[in-house]
């Protein structure tokens, strides 16, 4: 969740403090602390990304999306914020916009497993099964020990009538 280039002015103690609150599920307290830090260090993409994650955890998806958008507007090459925005847009039902955001994350970081994985899920939701298959295959190429990707790929291949390939992916998921 941290990127040392983004929060170079923030102290490690400040960063650790808000991450500890987030990790402990104390999202509102984390938001309060981040707002204070944001006043001290305005336009820090890391802070907007983290507050977006807090809002998302609280189920405040619209607010979450706005924070992730702010982060990527400040730092257009912030792959994690693009990925987070994509996931949130998917959760909001804005699937085409989600694909765009996830693809931006991948353009910045081509082997970004989480972005490829969420892109595959979004393609499936769009019923673009061939694209979903390709995305899961990329996930597996980059991380061959991602059991859920094999399982999900198996489900897609089964739906596409490719039973033998589906079985191979299920077996691989079980092996892992």
Question: Could you tell me what each predicted segment is?
Answer:
Residues 1-13:
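TPR-adjacent "capping" and linker segments in tetratricopeptide-repeat scaffold/adaptor proteins
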Residues 10-40, 53, 57:
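Alpha-helical segment of the N-proximal tetratricopeptide repeat
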Residues 15, 19, 46-57, 80-91, ...:
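Conserved alpha-helical positions within TPR/SEL1-like repeat arrays
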